[in-house]
């Protein structure tokens, strides 16, 4: 297979399985020599912020001299971004070879059991674990797909577990309450393994407290055990002070905006420090400073054009939209235009309501390239917004009607990805 055929093969697997357990991926991993049982891992979950935190953790540990694998989803520009080593995406040739190897293992299993198969995410996760072992990374930072306990990534014993926050999202899979969702996410907490979390809402904190009581895990919580006592905008980024029991690190800079990124970066620092302590690896304040300064993360309040001023953001649930609105009010004193595309399996009504209440000009558009896109009929019910056939049409209307207003495109990482690929290069 060539590269295009390889990516098409990966996407040919079913998206969901009838049962949410680890039997399929463990069977495939066993056929690959159980790479997930070898090496060191950091496991990261959370409704929002897990990608930003995982990215920053990897950058900080890379700055300390470690070779770091990073497994995330979804990709923004190219599939290869999902499996990176020292922030270099897996090369095309390496991806082709790795997929061929994992495919051969899968086909051997299917010769023994004709109806055996895995989901797309299970295949990619097994691929990531195998590739990281082949490249002998020092540590791999693994971002959960959805939830935690039954997620395909949850087949490892990490050095440290991370839970950024708990909010309502993926309710059909995880449940309709904070408590239910928190129980899924707390499923990555392992016996005796430290866990670093955000300042969780009370219902989620109660779940984690009960979990660590049974696992005997050390629990390090934002705003209790570590904090950001001081922060301010610094260009299109932030400068802040981090504090924990070891003292303060001042004037840290990160190229990310939004108050919630202060929490994510603090979680990343604390996680890296816990990892270093657990593995007796030297980690200096300068490593932390250098790693955070490099922690750009695409499609997270990312400015992709100055003239016109265009920002893309992957906020995809009501909690994420709340954080986005707060950040935009801090960033801009003038009116802004919002272009929002939301998936049908999200709480699109609440998201659209919050955006239209906060901003006078909101265009609603379909998310391209995914069967999960909200159909036009769903948008028509949201009468406050202006329905457009595409984000390109909404962008053109905004540039024509209010050419001097900043434009923010949000609602889904899939939409942010499509916009970024088109405006910054890649497929149209």
UniProtKB/Swiss-Prot annotation:
EC id: 6.3.2.17
In-chain residues carrying the UniProt-annotated modification N6-carboxylysine: 185
Domain of life: Bacteria
UniProt keyword annotations, A-Z: ATP-binding, Ligase, Magnesium, Metal-binding, Nucleotide-binding, One-carbon metabolism
pH dependence: Optimum pH is about 10.
Residues that hold Mg(2+) 1 according to the record: 73, 143
SUPFAM superfamilies: MurD-like peptide ligases, catalytic domain, MurD-like peptide ligases, peptide-binding domain
Catalytic activity: (6S)-5,6,7,8-tetrahydrofolyl-(gamma-L-Glu)(n) + L-glutamate + ATP = (6S)-5,6,7,8-tetrahydrofolyl-(gamma-L-Glu)(n+1) + ADP + phosphate + H(+); (6R)-5,10-methylenetetrahydrofolyl-(gamma-L-Glu)(n) + L-glutamate + ATP = (6R)-5,10-methylenetetrahydrofolyl-(gamma-L-Glu)(n+1) + ADP + phosphate + H(+); 10-formyltetrahydrofolyl-(gamma-L-Glu)(n) + L-glutamate + ATP = 10-formyltetrahydrofolyl-(gamma-L-Glu)(n+1) + ADP + phosphate + H(+)
Subunit structure: Monomer.
PANTHER family: DIHYDROFOLATE SYNTHETASE-RELATED, FOLYLPOLYGLUTAMATE SYNTHASE-RELATED
Record's miscellaneous remark: In contrast to many bacteria such as E.coli and Corynebacterium spp., L.casei cannot synthesize folate de novo, and requires exogenous folates for growth. L.casei metabolizes folate to polyglutamates of chain length up to 11, with octa- and nonaglutamates predominating.
Name of this chain's protein: Folylpolyglutamate synthase
Organism the protein comes from: Lacticaseibacillus casei
